[in-house]
Amino acid sequence: MDRPGFSSPPFNDKKIVLSPPPIESKQYSFLQQHNANSGPPVGFQERQQSVGYNLQQEFETLTADLDLDLRNNKDMQQNVDAPLPTTQSGNVGRGMMPSTSQYGFGELGTGGSLQNALLTDAALSPNLPTASSHSALGSLLNNNGNGSFLPPLASIPNRPQSVNDFSNFFNRQQQQQQTIDRQQQQQATNFYSDLIVFCNWIETLNPRDNITMIDYLCNNLPLDILLTFKSKLDSHLTHYHNQSATSQPLHQQQNQPVSFGVLSPYQQQQNDILAEMENLNLDNSLSSDAGASLNQKSAPALQQPKPKLNSVRNHGSHLYAEQQTQRPRSADPNIHKYSPNYNLPQQQFERTKSPTSHLYEKTNFLQLAAANSNPPSVSQQKGANNSDDSVDLSAHAALKLGALATINSRVALDSNRKSHVHSAHGHQQPHSHYFPQQGASQHGPFSPASAYEESINRSANSSSVPILVQHNKSPPGLTRSKKSTEGLGQGANASSGSPQTTSTTSMPADISNPDLLNNIPAWLKLLRLHKYTDCLKDIYWKDLIEYDDLSLEKRGVKALGARRKLLKAFDAVKESS
């Protein structure tokens, strides 16, 4: 059958294209003669054309990858003249021969497994006699029972011999290991040769170049390398010195030739240092310490200066009298009788220098009056009534009298009243006490009423003066009644009918004293508001008494009770002036 494309040049001269593969000229001429004698086989039109084409593409790809020449043209020429007999081996299928011979796949050799899977169908090649027409297939199929796709390797003359050599396949790892060992040995040889060259180069340098080289290495080498080199050098020098010392004396060692690793310009200096180290011992260190201690003893000893007294703290000590001797919160006149600073005259001198010495005089007088109360009168009264009710009644009477005495303590405790009380009872005071400012003794007993009014007056008027007196113990009933009724003194003051006490009964009598008003810190201390001294000390008193509640709060007086107390004091000063 004449088809287009078969008259083109041979397959070897053309590139591979996606078209039905051409066949060679000899095969094509053979097929033309065969087709002229016999017509196309039955069922040729129903044959699947793509099977042979796919096999050809796979074969060409495999040939290009392996770079092998699988075409045996010599055998093909011999087999063209001598056609194959019709009888083939049992492993070759019937349907393989006509289709492969027609499409130029006669040189393909296949085994029984592949031909049974693809080409044994009778529909693909129904014409059996055409199997004997292709002469080239016989030479490839003479290998009976061979299941390989390719022909035997011995039949390919152009195949390189190294392909068949598998002797070194399992020895590659050993060869690689031997190669690595040779390279390492060569590198080690090169390393030691480089070290020898480097040492020889160092020996040729002069001392100045040696110093330059050492400086460069110290500045550029890593720290760990320098430390390792230092330790090795120390151990080497120590070993060299010990070995030399055992063999010969030190003066002979200096005349020896320079050994390897020790620089000759510095050998003398090194030997001197080692000699000095040998001469050092424990006795030398002890003697040096003893000499240092003698030098220290000969030097003048340094004396620590004594701390200076704080003159600022001592200045104005009348405002800080509370810091010298602590004052209790209850302001009880009996607390400080066992104080260690009981008879110190220094406090008396400081009080005489104070601008408010008249307040101290009045307060101390009240303290002495409260301390010199006459307990026998209370005991007589208790023996007459034989009950504690009389003591309670006398305590209430004392509170009322004390409320009257707070108006003016000097008038309530004048000398006429004290002499009258002394003549009425006919008793003399067993103890005598000196006043701190006057230096005179006072005698005479006092009633419980006068004692309590002095105690209440003292608690209301004096806030910063320590108590320096002693007194006899009072009966327990009187003490209990005092504790239970001491807080009611101001209420009694408010209910008293004195013409001078309206809204300022809780204020001290000297609240409007001009001397105190000119000294705001002392005036605030009298009111027990000295904690606000820093807020109000810079204000003139005539301006201060005009302040209201809001102004005081702005100045820093945050407590409501303190503001109310200041406002009452301002009203008292305004009324008195």
Curated annotation (Swiss-Prot):
Biased composition (Polar residues): 26-38, 286-298, 340-355
Skewed-composition ranges (Low complexity): 495-506
Ranges where the SAM domain occurs: 515-576
Gene3D superfamilies in UniProt: Transcription Factor, Ets-1
Location of region: Disordered: 1-41, 286-355, 415-510
GO process annotations (BP): nuclear-transcribed mRNA poly(A) tail shortening; protein transport
SMART domains, alphabetized: SAM
Keyword line: Cytoplasm, Nucleotide-binding, Protein transport, RNA-binding, Transport
Domain of life of the organism encoding this protein: Eukaryota
Location within or outside the cell: Cytoplasm, Cytosol; Cytoplasm, P-body
CDD domains membership: SAM_VTS1_fungal
GO molecular function, one term: mRNA binding
Cellular compartments per GO CC: cytosol; P-body
Family: Belongs to the VTS1 family.
PANTHER family given in the database record: PROTEIN SMAUG, STERILE ALPHA MOTIF DOMAIN CONTAINING PROTEIN 4-RELATED
Subunit comment: Monomer. Binds to RNA.
UniProt protein name: RNA-binding protein VTS1
Annotated organism of origin: Debaryomyces hansenii (strain ATCC 36239 / CBS 767 / BCRC 21394 / JCM 1990 / NBRC 0083 / IGC 2968)
Gene that specifies this protein: VTS1
